[in-house]
Swiss-Prot record:
Main location: cytoplasm
InterPro entries noted in UniProt: Mur-like_cat_sf, Mur_ligase_C, Mur_ligase_C_dom_sf, Mur_ligase_cen, Mur_ligase_N, MurCDEF_pg_biosynth, UDP-N-AcMur_Ala_ligase_MurC
EC number: 6.3.2.8
Protein family membership: Belongs to the MurCDEF family.
Binding locations of ATP: 132-138
Subcellular localization, as worded in the UniProt entry: Cytoplasm
The organism's place on the tree of life at top rank: Bacteria
Keywords: ATP-binding, Cell cycle, Cell division, Cell shape, Cell wall biogenesis/degradation, Cytoplasm, Ligase, Nucleotide-binding, Peptidoglycan synthesis
Keyword Lipid biosynthesis appears in the UniProt entry: no
Protein name: UDP-N-acetylmuramate--L-alanine ligase
Reactions listed under catalytic activity: UDP-N-acetyl-alpha-D-muramate + L-alanine + ATP = UDP-N-acetyl-alpha-D-muramoyl-L-alanine + ADP + phosphate + H(+)
Length: 512
């Protein structure tokens, strides 16, 4: 990168070839090291023996963990933080005017996107990528859990924690001694174009990230291209029309090593052009049982032998998790795990952190946290909630993520949230965006859309409350014995759970 040229950060530019290895990086500095994806990669490089440090704006559970591993984290982003680095890593949240980017550019240092680091870690491994609008973290976590239980000791790079027993959490990054690497492939900025996985899982192709892709056609085309880069198999959900459209657009040679999956019986599907098919025969959760029963009909293309009908009992609720299990189990079997062992391990999986995660109960009011931030994810969450808690009032505190997503999907959010009984919508989490660029978008945008629904939201109380603490207190005052309150969103609403539990205790007379 010439020091005389303007700084352009292009996440789709590939910085390394297939021969590159972590040792080639030299001392490596991460800007925003506490981010979900960045912290995992920093930890994995550290485990590979690379000298790693980083900076972030504030302390978090992620930065605390990195420091316990011996990784230096500076708080505040300043030019001097990159002085000793040979390689500087940024994410799509980092702008060209960041002082550490400016200093690294002026010094002629190597500046790479976080996806370059993940691509580098894949070199020499049997890599499994998980891309898609929904289900990436759960599917990659479940697959990693299955492989760990099978004794494979995989490496994995997952943008979140994994739920462990007794309310504990396991870190989403691990540098294993085996030859398998499981990773989320973030499609939001197009950077997954750098990956050439052995197995490419595509969980869902519903439109999202239109701020980057412009329209649905370009978004779907990116998944078609991603499938074409897989060196082994493609595993893709075709329960949604967009997934089926992506499959149909694949070249014949890609379809020939593709495994589609879904809940529709094979005889009711159109011609799949040579792709194999895993049918998910869901027996559904017995209301309130906490177990999702299903049978996976695995074809010979997956088992490398005779077709197998494998029963699975999941502890994670909802049809969407049955789909996630189909993808994870299919990939595990393709990697050499027996169907029975894969199903048994999947049945002990408790979920990724912030996915239907129970945070506590006060006076028989249960608080559950979930990362859902797209209308389809919210609809799936609330459907699962009705199955898990059939006799409860379902209340939701929702923090929208991104002004652009709120603008694009306001009506769809309103329709999904109408599945709840009570809804409070808090201030929008901006992430990389600025309110000034979206002056007319606010929590009321979704509330106004809900008011325009004819029947769907007739029984749902929905209000905008900008301040999350106030929202928690208001919802606590509305709660009653047996209710379930969900905190929902991809932003910092997860930090409100303790506030909500405290508010419920303070207003415990409402819960009795």
């Amino acid at each position: 990168m010439s020091q005389d040229q303007p700084i352009v950060l292009d996440p789709t530019y590939a910085s390394f070839d297939a021969a590159a290895r972590p040792a080639d990086l030299g001392a490596t500095h991460f800007i925003g090291i506490g981010g979900a994806g960045m912290s995992v990669l920093a930890e994995m490089l550290h485990a590979e023996g690379v000298s790693v440090d980083g900076s972030d704006r504030s302390h978090s559970a992620k930065t605390d963990r990195l420091e316990t591993l011996g990784i230096t984290v500076e708080f505040g982003q300043r030019a001097e933080n990159v002085a000793q680095a040979e390689t500087v890593v940024y994410s799509s949240a980092i702008k060209p005017d960041n002082p550490e980017i400016v200093a690294a550019h002026a010094a002629g240092k190597r500046i790479v996107h976080r996806s370059d680091i993940l691509a580098l870690l894949m070199n020499g491994k049997r890599a499994v990528t998980v891309a898609g609008a929904h289900g990436k973290t759960t599917t990659s976590s479940m697959l990693s859990h299955i492989l760990v239980n099978a004794g494979a000791d995989p490496s994995y790079a997952i943008g979140g924690f994994i739920q462990g027993p007794d309310g504990t959490t396991l870190d989403g990054g691990h540098a294993g001694k085996g030859d398998i690497l499981v990773a989320e492939a973030d499609e939001s900025d197009g950077s997954f174009a750098k990956y050439h996985p052995t197995i490419a899982i595509i969980t869902n192709c519903e439109a999202d990230h239109l701020d980057h892709y412009g329209d649905e056609a370009h978004y779907r085309a990116a998944f078609v291209a991603h499938a074409g880069r897989a060196t082994g198999h493609v595993i893709i959900s075709i329960d949604d029309p967009d997934g089926l459209a992506v499959l149909e657009a694949m070249p014949a040679d890609v379809k020939s090593h593709t495994v589609a999956y879904g809940t529709t019986a094979r005889e009711s599907l159109p011609d799949l052009g040579g792709a194999a098919y895993v049918w998910i025969a869901s027996e559904s959760e017995t209301a309130g049982s906490g177990v999702e029963q299903l049978t996976l009909h695995l074809p010979a293309a997956v088992t490398a032998g005779e077709p197998v009908s494998q029963s699975v009992a999941l502890k994670v609720p909802g049809v969407h998790n049955a789909r996630n299990a189909a993808a994870a189990i299919s990939a595990a079997v393709l990697l050499g795990v027996s169907p029975a062992d894969a199903a048994k391990a999947a049945g002990t999986f408790l979920g990724a952190a912030r996915r239907f995660q129970v945070r506590g109960t006060v006076k028989q009011v249960t608080v559950v946290d979930d990362y859902a931030h797209h209308p389809t994810e919210i609809a799936a969450l609330l459907d699962a909630a009705r199955r898990r808690y059939p006799d409860s009032t379902i209340r939701v505190i929702f923090q929208p993520h991104l002004f652009s997503r709120t603008k694009f999907f306001a009506h769809q959010f309103a329709e999904s949230l109408a599945k709840a009984d009570d809804v409070i919508i808090t201030g929008i989490f901006p992430a990389r965006e600025k309110q000034a660029d979206f002056p007319d978008i606010s929590p009321s945008t979704i509330v106004d859309a809900a008011a325009g629904l004819k029947d769907a939201s007739a029984g749902t109380w929905i209000q905008p409350v900008e301040d999350m603490c106030l929202a928690a207190k208001m919802m606590a005052m509305r709660a009653h014995h047996g209710d379930v309150i969900f905190t929902v969103g991809a932003g910092d609403i997860t930090d409100m759970d303790q506030v909500l539990l405290t508010a419920l205790e303070a207003h415990r007379e409402s819960c009795e």
